[in-house]
Amino acid sequence: VHRLEGGAEDHATPKLPAHSRHGPAPSRDSLRGLDWFVFFMADVQTGFGPFVSVYLTTQAWTQVDIGLVLTVGSLIALAGQMPGGAVVDAARSERLVAACGVIAISASAFALAAWPIFLLVLLGRVLHAAASCVLGPAMAAISLGLVGHAGIGERLGRNARFASIGTGLAAAAMGALGYLTSSRYVFFATAALIVPTLIALFRIRPGEIDPERAHGGKHDAGLRKLGEGLLALAGNRPLLILAACALFFHLANAAMLPLMGSLLTTRSSDWATVLIAACIVVPQLVVAAFSPWVGRQAQQWGRRPLLLVGFAALPLRGVLFGAVTDPFLLVGVQLLDGISAAMLGVLVPLVIADATRGTGRFNLAQGIVGSAVGIGASLSTTLAGYASDTLGSSAAFFGLAALGFAGLILVWTSLPETRPDAVD
């Protein structure tokens, strides 16, 4: 076995966490299975990004109907965060929950491609949103159940790397597929990805997922204690502060790229598509490169120093977006988005795991923070759009930067260091 605290990372083969009191280290087969499950899940979720509105437009849908379907999906995703986490906490098998979620998303993609009528598409979006609410917590629970707190930092970093690579490759492949054939085949391809996704999932050996570690402690097997769990978490100060910090971060962050995309279109219409694509790809490259390092350093340095770096990059990015006029330099500014994404993508679930250790409510807590993220992101685009229309795009970016700075101050002044002195 390898020590998690030092040494060069083996990029080809996941490291085995040290033997813990809960049982032996997970097998390489399980760890590789988790790598590829994360990768293919990112592929599947990418199929439901901007391709939905493009496809429905080609099917002669009105913008009102498209907007309604997307809004319903967003509302279900927001409302389902806490119930989704509670379902994973109550489940006896995280693999089974994840498999059901994958099947639901695949069915949704197939229905969307085969029968693009309003009712079926609406039901498909609801199904996809509900499945997504359990897949995120299930993936984190499987990770924690396999490696425990001793290895969760590096494991989350590895998850972020594979998710980032999967997202980037899937966006390129599905964009090419839609261009060469039609956007309908993007969703048939998404549905077909159920096969490698489930193969990867079932490479993870169920006996190696420690149920107590997966839930952050001993957990009730039913949903009847959901109220008790919520009350207990309502008194968890680090968790609530983290949720507030996440709300401020996404209140500032969610509107930045769409607003900048509009700005690029007006300043450089000929290059707009290429520049926007570059603004999406550049952060993914940063996340893929640095996420494992973030996971390792979080075990050595603690969570707060790295979180402060991730939060500090956001207001700096907002100020630069408001001040820089060269459209090509704006792509370079997106490197800061990659830094924030690498830091928060690893550290937010890591702090949740720290804060809920021993409670058995790790996944419900993920739902609470996920709800805060959803609220912040939902309000962000509305506030930024209003500010841009009334005060101008530069003022909107400076306003978003101020909100991001408020999140940074909250982390600096209120969020405690959660790294445990002794890990299992």
Specify the residue positions occupied by each region the protein language model found.
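Juxtamembrane intracellular "pre-TM" segments in multi-pass secondary transporters
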Residues: 15-31, 207-242
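Helix-loop boundary and gating motifs at the non-cytosolic
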Residues: 23-74, 240-241, 245, 250-264
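Central cavity-lining transmembrane alpha-helices of secondary-active solute carriers
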Residues: 68-86, 281-293
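Helix-to-loop junctions at the C-terminal end of transmembrane segments
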Residues: 80-93, 178, 290-302
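Structural signature of the two symmetry-related core transmembrane helices
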Residues: 96-110, 305-320
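Cytoplasmic helix-loop-helix junction between adjacent transmembrane helices
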Residues: 124-164, 351, 358
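Symmetry-related core transmembrane helices of the 12-TM Major Facilitator Superfamily/SLC fold
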Residues: 185-202, 397-412
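A late C-terminal transmembrane helix in Major Facilitator Superfamily
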Residues: 361-389
